[in-house]
Amino acid sequence: MTGFGARLAAAKAQRGPLCVGIDPHPELLRAWDLPTTADGLAAFCDICVEAFAGFAVVKPQVAFFEAYGAAGFAVLERTIAALRSAGVLVLADAKRGDIGTTMAAYAAAWAGDSPLAADAVTASPYLGFGSLRPLLEAAAAHDRGVFVLAATSNPEGATVQRAAFDGRTVAQLVVDQAAVVNRSTNPAGPGYVGVVVGATVLQPPDLSALGGPVLVPGLGVQGGRPEALAGLGGAEPGQLLPAVAREVLRAGPDVAELRAAADRMLDAVAYLDA
């Protein structure tokens, strides 16, 4: 299988630089006249799969599936499989982070041969970047990607991410350590380790040497503006992967309306890969 960085670049070139989120919040299920049950969750996801099958990347928010227990995980497995069958890259927004054998177990679940394994997964480095090693190794072995939280847009994040250590912010250290992995594993091409930088972050870390993709959540309802993303953190053209969820999902449940809302956002960010 081709490495994740190359597959992501190819998907963006063919389908455009947008990641669409599947966030089945109970309020959204009710707004779509669906029950807040595993059956309602499944119906919500079926609609999203049909609407977003033509986009490059789709990002299910794992927490909303976990809330329904085993039945929710079954819906997530089915949704991941359906999206991948449609040629969509799936980014599982699980934000996993732990140490030792526990991290290795998370790695097996989200980046190994598990039915939950997607094309990429989000991860938290705040037990130390080195704690992610089992996940990074599993992802590399299975040609999957990892997006590591660096600078998030929630106000609380700044208390940790903008703290200084060894002359750099913690967010910059995360980016720099991800860059080391990318240089050591794929110096000639796009790496498989990306970072997450919120669209509303006022002082983003320097991304120019990352050598991997940058997931940029927070467009639309959360305040991020597509026209303001160019050159975020010194990113190169084609490096950014903007993500949107609520701005699009509130157009549902009609499949055509959902697809049109996602298309409008894609049109707004297409210049980033031009």
Curated annotation (Swiss-Prot):
Catalysis: reaction(s): orotidine 5'-phosphate + H(+) = UMP + CO2
Cystine crosslinks: none
Keywords noted in UniProt: Decarboxylase, Lyase, Pyrimidine biosynthesis
Pathway: Pyrimidine metabolism; UMP biosynthesis via de novo pathway; UMP from orotate: step 2/2
Active site feature: 95 (proton donor)
Enzyme class per UniProt: lyase
Biological processes per GO annotation: 'de novo' pyrimidine nucleobase biosynthetic process; 'de novo' UMP biosynthetic process
Leader sequence segment: none
InterPro entries referenced in this protein's UniProt entry, alphabetically: Aldolase_TIM, OMPdecase_AS, OMPdecase_type-2, OMPdeCOase_dom, RibuloseP-bd_barrel
One example GO MF annotation: orotidine-5'-phosphate decarboxylase activity
EC number(s) given by UniProt: 4.1.1.23
Family: Belongs to the OMP decarboxylase family. Type 2 subfamily.
UniProt xrefs under NCBIfam families: pyrF_sub2 (TIGR02127)
HAMAP family noted in UniProt: OMPdecase_type2
PANTHER family per record: OROTIDINE 5'-PHOSPHATE DECARBOXYLASE
UniProt protein name: Orotidine 5'-phosphate decarboxylase
